[in-house]
Amino acid sequence: MDKLRGARPLRLLLLLLALLPALRGQDLSMEECCDKGVEWANKNRICTSLPLISESRECSMTQVQCCRSKLEEHYCSDGIEFASVHEECDSHNGENSTCEAEYFKKCCYCCLLGKTAQVQGQSCEPNLKIGYQCGIVFRACCVKGQEGTDVSISDDAPKKEQVEISKEELDQEDPYLHDGCRGGGPCSQQCRDTGSSYVCSCFVGYQLQPDGVNCEDINECITGTHSCGIGQTCVNTLGSFRCQRDTSCGTGYELTDDSRCKDIDECETGTHNCPPDFICQNTPGSFRCRPKLQCMNGFIQDALGNCIDINECLSTNMPCPAGQICINTDGSYTCQRISPSCGRGYHLNEDGTRCVDVDECSSSDQPCGEGHVCINGPGNYRCECKSGYSFDVISRTCIDINECRRYPGRLCAHKCENTPGSYYCTCTMGFKLSSDGRSCEDLNECESSPCSQECANVYGSYQCYCRRGFQLSDIDGISCEDIDECALPTGGHICSFRCINIPGSFQCTCPSTGYRLAPNARNCQDIDECVAETHNCSFNETCFNIQGGFRCLSLECPENYRKSGDTVRLEKTDTIRCIKSCRPNDVNCVLDPVHTISHTVISLPTFREFTRPEEIIFLRAITPTYPANQADIIFDITEGNLRESFDIIKRYMDGMTVGVVRQVRPIVGPFHAILKLEMNYVMGGVVSHRNIVNVHIFVSEYWF
C-alpha cells in the first residue's frame, strides 16, 4: 500500500479477478514453431531477421533455437566438407558472421583430427576431452576414412550420402546413445553430459541465460571489459568487440587493421612529385625532394637544381672584422679596411671605423641655461624649456605652466593639483587613482573586511549583506542578526512536524518513534517496521505497516475458505485473500455466492485541510465472459462506516468497472475502523457471486 506524501491521499490499487476466465486462442504446437525456424534457416542462412509467427514466448524461443541449430548444422557440414577436400582449415576465408566461422572451423578441425587418427591406425572412439559435438565429427570422419563413405551430420546437407546404421549396430557401436547431449542436446551452444543429466555452457563472449539453456552475447562495451584505448570507441560484436578510432589519421597517414595510424611512404608507393633531378626522401606524414647534384662551398642550389652564389656579405653575422667592409665575390668574399673623415659635430669611434655624433648635452658644461633642457641632434643640439614650462620673451626665462588652470576639467577625472613644472590628480572618497595617473577607479572597500559577514562593493561605496538565515542590523548596517525561521508566518509549513531555530538556520524533527527525517531534512518519513523486521509480531500474526507504527493482525480464513498461496505484497501493504474451497457434496457451500474474502490494510494521515472527498481505495474487476449489458457490478459498504465518513461510487475505467472508496468527512487520528466492502455480480436481478474485501483503516494523528 503506497503511503501518502504531503496532503495527497493514499490510493490503493486492489485487483480482484472474476472467477470466469476469458477465452484464449489456441497456440501453435512446438513442432510447427520449430519447422518454421528450420525452414527460415534453410532458405536464408541467417537467423537475425527471423520473423516470429506467434506472440507466445515458448513458440518464439523454439523457433529461434531450431533456426540456430539448423544453421550450426550447415556450418558444421561445410567445415567437414572443406576438411575432406583440402586436408586443412586455415585457408578458408569466411565473409559471414563470427558465429559461422566458429562452427565451420570447429567441425573442420575435429574432422582433421578424426582423419589423422584413421591414418595413424588409432581407434575412432575419441578418448580426448574434445566435447560431445567434436567427438561425433571426429568419429564420423575417422569411420569415413575406414569405410570410404561420405560424412554428413544433417538430414538435408547437400551433396552428401548418408551412412545408414541399423539400430543393433547403433546400440553396439555408439557410446553416446544414452548421452543427454546426443544430437546437440537442449543446449544452444555447448553441452556436457554428467551421466544422469547435462550441463550447458557458452562460448567465449557469451553468457548463460537464467533458463540454463540459451546463451546471450556479452556487451563488453557496456560491462567495461574491453581493451580499447584513449581515442578509440568500443563497438560490440557477437561474441566479441572491436576498437574503432574516433578521428581520422590526417594527411600522410593511413589507418591499419588494428585502428592505428601508419605513415605512408610516398617514396615507396610512387605518390611523390619530385622532379627527375631530385631524390625522394620520406618524412613522417610527408616527404622531401633532395637534389641529386651537390654544389661546391660558397654556392647553394635553387628550386631548379642550379648552383648559385651565396652573398656572404648579406649574412646577419658580419664575416669581416670591425673597421672593414665586406665585398662579395663569386663563391666567396673579401674584406677591405675603411678610413673615414668626420665633419663638425662628429668624431671617430674608438675603433676608428666610423663617425659617430658628439653628444654636447652630456658634457659637464651645460650649453643651456637654468630651467632649460638640452636636446641633442645629429651633429648639433638645441635648448628648449622643460616640460611644464614656457619661454617668457620679456625675461628670457622659462616659467611654470599652471596646467590645472589652463586645461580645467580636461586633465584629471576628479581633482587637479598644480606643481612646479607639472601637476598631479587626486580622487574623491570611495575612489583611487588609476595607473594612468589621471582616471579614478572604484575603491574596493570590501578588501578591508568592513562587514561582519558578506560585503558587496558598489561604485564609490560598499554594501554589507548577510548569509542565509541572518539579516542586517538596523542599528549599524554592518552586523548580522539571526533570523528565527520557525517564528515566521510560514514557519509552520517549513517542517512537517516540529521546527527548532539555530543560528543562521533551523532544524526539523520528527516524532520519537515510527518516523525518520527524510533526505530533504524537512519531511518526516514513515519507518516500515515490517520490512526492517523490527516488529514484535508472533509467527501466527501478520505484520502490517501503518504511518508511524505497525499492527500485528491474525487473519484466518473462515470455514470452507482457504488462503490463495502466499501473502501478496502490494506496494508495502500485505493483502490476504481467501478463496472458497468446498468439501465434496457440500451443497450449501457451493450455493454460497461469496467466492473470495480479502483482508488488506490502509494507513491515512489526518488531513490538515479537507475541502473535497479524497479517493483512497480502488476496487477493479474484470467483467465475466457474458455480455456486459446482461451483468452489473454493485459495490456497497456493509459494515464499519462510522459517522458515514466513507462512501463508494462506481466508475468505468479502461473497459473495467471500478469501485472507488472515498473519505467524505474529516477524521482526526488516531482512528481505526474496519470497512466491509462487497462487490456483487448481478444478472437478471440476482447476485451470481460476491467478493468481500475487509479494509483495516488506520488514521494517523499527524498530517504527514
From Swiss-Prot:
Biological process (GO) annotations held by this record are:
extracellular matrix organization
GO MF terms listed in the record are: calcium ion binding; peptidase activator activity
The Anaphylatoxin-like domain covers 33-74, 75-109, 110-142
Q: Which UniProt keywords apply?
A: Calcium, Disulfide bond, EGF-like domain, Extracellular matrix, Glycoprotein, Repeat, Secreted, Signal
Tell me the SUPFAM superfamilies matching this sequence: EGF/Laminin, Growth factor receptor domain
Say if the entry is tagged with keyword Secreted.
Answer: yes
Q: Spell out the residue ranges making up region: Self-association and FN1-binding.
A: 357-441
Residues annotated as domain EGF-like? 177-216, 217-262, 263-308, 309-356, 357-399, 400-441, 442-481, 482-525, 526-579
InterPro entries named among the record's database cross-references: Anaphylatoxin/fibulin, cEGF, EGF-like_Ca-bd_dom, EGF-like_dom, EGF-type_Asp/Asn_hydroxyl_site, EGF_Ca-bd_CS, Fibulin-1, Fibulin_C
User: Its principal location?
Assistant: secreted
Pfam families this protein is in? ANATO, cEGF, EGF_CA, Fibulin_C
Q: List the disulfide bonds.
A: C33-C59, C34-C66, C47-C67, C76-C107, C89-C108, C110-C134, C111-C141, C124-C142, C181-C191, C187-C200, C202-C215, C221-C234, C228-C243, C249-C261, C267-C280, C274-C289, C295-C307, C313-C326, C320-C335, C342-C355, C361-C374, C368-C383, C385-C398, C404-C416, C412-C425, C427-C440, C446-C455, C451-C464, C466-C480, C486-C499, C495-C508, C510-C524, C530-C543, C537-C552, C557-C578
Q: Where is it localised?
A: Secreted, Extracellular space, Extracellular matrix
Q: Which GO terms describe its cellular component?
A: extracellular region
Instruction: Say if the entry is tagged with keyword Calcium.
Output: yes
Family listed? Belongs to the fibulin family.
Complex formation: Homomultimerizes and interacts with various extracellular matrix components.
According to its UniProt entry, the function of this protein is described as: Incorporated into fibronectin-containing matrix fibers. May play a role in cell adhesion and migration along protein fibers within the extracellular matrix (ECM). Could be important for certain developmental processes and contribute to the supramolecular organization of ECM architecture, in particular to those of basement membranes.
Protein name as catalogued: Fibulin-1
Gene source species: Gallus gallus
Q: What is the lineage of its organism?
A: Eukaryota, Metazoa, Chordata, Craniata, Vertebrata
Q: Which gene encodes it?
A: FBLN1
